[in-house]
Amino acid sequence: MEWVWLIVFAAGLALAGRAYLRSDGAGELPPKRPLLLVPVCSPGDRTSPALLEWAAGCLAEELGAKVTLAERPVYLQKDAFHPHTRQGDAVHIVNLVEPLVTPDRAVLGVTEYDLHSPMRRDLPFAMGARKGWAGLLSTYRMEDRANPDNTRVRLRKMLVRYGAELMCDAPRNEDPTSLLFNGLQSPEQLDEMGL
């Protein structure tokens, strides 16, 4: 009988550890800095203001952080896009966002363009990029045509992922059910992650 309780106790510890890993970046770490949310688009185009306001609300609600909207977008020129795939170069674009970072503020650029990463040629697209306290998030691949309500859930998860990294210094991990999973490569994987 003693062994049964010991096994149950050990299983409980294992599950508690897994839950801690799942919430480590969002609920467990307080924000260390505010975030500037900035639209990223081409001249003459614009990122939906309603999308940005919703994103700011999600980040404030989920992370308890101060989020402000940038007054002006980061504009992209033609050299930010691959000439054949017409995807934005995530590394190039996050470098354009980075100058907005200050010693006491992180920055997250939000774009509706499809992205690729020259650093990950094994992947046909990128959902975002990060460099220090600068991040970039693409909404392009978040759509779930089979379940349209899931589109916003996916986007919320990506916002919390980047927000937790940029504002809370949350580390990535190897738990595929965590928003901070290091191996995230597709929007479908977001469906398996808790919020």
Can you say where each PLM-predicted feature lies in the sequence?
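Ser/Thr/Pro/Gly-rich low-complexity linker/stalk segments immediately outside membranes or between
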Residues: 21-31
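Short, histidine-centered active-site or binding-site loop motifs used for metal coordination
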Residues: 39-41, 140-143, 184
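Metzincin-family zinc-dependent endopeptidase catalytic domain
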Residues: 49-162, 166-170
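Feature marks short, highly hydrophobic, charge-poor N-terminal signal-anchor/signal peptide-like helices
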Residues: 1-5
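Fold-level signature of zinc-dependent metallopeptidase catalytic domains
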Residues: 32-47
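Short intrinsically disordered coil segments
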Residues: 9, 124-126, 195
